[in-house]
Amino acid sequence: MENVFKNIVSTSWLEEHLEAPDIRIIDSSWYFPHEKRNAEQEFIECHIPGASFFDIDKIKDSESDLPHMLPPSEMFNSSIRKLGIGDGHKVVIYDGFGMRSAARLWWMFRVFGCSDVVVLDGGFPKWIKENRSTTADLNEKEIRHLTVFEDRSIVADRDDV
């Protein structure tokens, strides 16, 4: 039987692998305007050690009138490489809600051919509740090479729905 949880990792697993050279961590937090929260500012103030911030409001298809549409592959590739993510890295994504925008970014990685990507079970709220380490340190990441290719078979358009 296939492991149905292969796309989710526990907080204890991530804590054990924080220093692993092939692990990259991304905070993909995003909030609805009525929530009056600033995801990037919250990241700057407190995040999982080694994490980078992915801004879904900036890395999108700017030609579309709809919010958060998939960015062109070149934009996604460039943005992810600047976060220090390259071929051979396992990416762990979390958000400040638990599992809302993290699932969206997980899907974006899959669309662009990056399959070694997982979501942190319970996200940052669970990490905090368990008193795991946090930091305000912002580390510059070395730009890496990342091979991307689009897999539109997992994208639905209006006709598909």
Please give the residue ranges for each predicted region.
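Cytosolic catalytic domains that perform sulfur/thiol-centered chemistry
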Residues: M1-V161
